[in-house]
Amino acid sequence: DARSACYQMNHDFEDIEVKENAVELLEAALKSRRKKCMIGTGAMTDPYMPIEKTLCNTRKCLELIDRYGFGAAVHTKSALVLRDIDILKSINNKSKAVVQMTLTTADDNLCKIIEPNVSVTSERYEALCSLRDEGIPTVVWLDPVLPFINDTKDNIARILDMCIKA
C-alpha cells in the first residue's frame, strides 16, 4: 500500500495530500483522448475518504468521465459512493460503471479496529445492495485475509453470503 518506502512519502500515513488540480488534469487528459476507455480510481487511495464529503473531487471527476463518455471503475471502502449514484447510473447507461468494494470482515466491531475511519462492513453491504438495485455492476474484494484474525471459516462464509445476496 501507500505506506511502502518506494512512494517516498515524507509525512505520516494518516496525513492527506490533496492534488488540488486533479479535476483540471483529468479534464485535459480526457479531452485529448480519441479512444474511450475505463477510467479507474481507488487502487492506491480510497476516492471516498471522509474529506471527499466536502471536497467533492471524486464527484467532479465522475461528472467529467460522464460528460466525455468514458467508463468508470471505482474501488472504495466507503458507502459515500452512494452520493454519486446518479452519475454512476448515467455513466453506466452510456458506457460502463463498476463499483468495487472491499469486505474484510463480517464483524462490524472487528472492522472498526482493523479498518478505522471507513464505513463498517454492514454499511458497505447495504451500499452494494443499493448499487445492485440501481443496475450498477459491483465487484467484491475479500482482502486482506489476516491469519488468526479474519481467516475463520465463519467469517469467510458470512462474507460470501453477503456477496451472494448483494
Model-derived segments and their meaning:
Residues 64-70, 126-138, 166:
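A structural motif corresponding to the C-terminal end of an alpha-helix
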Residues 91-93, 118, 157-159:
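Short, hinge-like loop/turn segments at secondary-structure boundaries
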Residues 54, 120, 152:
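Charged, low-complexity surface patches
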Residues 150-165:
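Catalytic cores of alpha/beta
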Residues 120-126:
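Active-site glycine-rich loop that binds ribose-phosphate moieties when present
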Residues 61, 84-87, 127, 141-145, ...:
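Short, hydrophobic/aromatic alpha-helical segments in well-folded domains
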Residues 106-108, 114-117, 130-152:
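Conserved strand-turn element in the central/C-terminal portion of the radical SAM core barrel
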Residues 1-100, 104-112, 125:
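Conserved Radical SAM active-site core
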